């Protein structure tokens, strides 16, 4: 039986499509009676245990609390931030308090908050 190096195997896998790789993984699991997802679950459990030690959030929801006097500017800001159409952005603004962005990176959330506040809206980061 020929022995392949890791580099040769990686090169071969790199030439396969995702469907072919998926079929390979299934065949490998059946042949060796293993499950590819098991190590990932263990790593996720370890990562989950370490997460409470971190106090700083890295994902934020940008909540439009109140529109203020400059509704048109707020709608324009919402459209620029979210790429929504005019009707969708107006509905979002009219429905305040509502989330403009969900699970946004800290810098993106702060930038969106600044844009909305500049347009005259009241904004919260959660």
Curated annotation (Swiss-Prot):
One of its GO terms (molecular function) is structural constituent of ribosome. Pfam families: Ribosomal_L12 (PF00542), Ribosomal_L12_N (PF16320). Coiled coil: none annotated. The keyword Ribonucleoprotein applies. Keywords: Ribonucleoprotein, Ribosomal protein. SUPFAM superfamilies: ClpS-like, Ribosomal protein L7/12, oligomerisation (N-terminal) domain. GO terms for biological process: translation. Gene3D superfamilies: 3.30.1390.10, Single helix bin. The keyword Ribosomal protein applies. This is Large ribosomal subunit protein bL12. It comes from Bifidobacterium longum subsp. infantis (strain ATCC 15697 / DSM 20088 / JCM 1222 / NCTC 11817 / S12). The gene is rplL.
């Amino acid at each position: 039986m020929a022995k392949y190096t890791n580099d040769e195997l990686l090169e071969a896998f790199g030439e396969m499509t995702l469907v072919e790789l998926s079929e390979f993984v299934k065949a490998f699991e059946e042949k060796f009676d293993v499950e590819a997802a098991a190590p990932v679950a263990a790593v996720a459990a370890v990562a989950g245990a370490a997460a409470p030690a971190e106090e700083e959030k890295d994902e934020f929801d940008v909540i439009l609390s109140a529109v203020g006097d400059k509704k048109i500017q707020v709608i324009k800001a919402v459209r620029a931030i979210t790429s929504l159409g005019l009707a969708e952005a107006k509905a979002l603004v009219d429905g305040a308090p509502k989330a403009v962005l969900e699970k946004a990176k800290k810098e993106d959330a702060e930038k969106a908050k600044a844009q909305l506040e500049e347009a005259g809206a009241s904004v919260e980061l959660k």
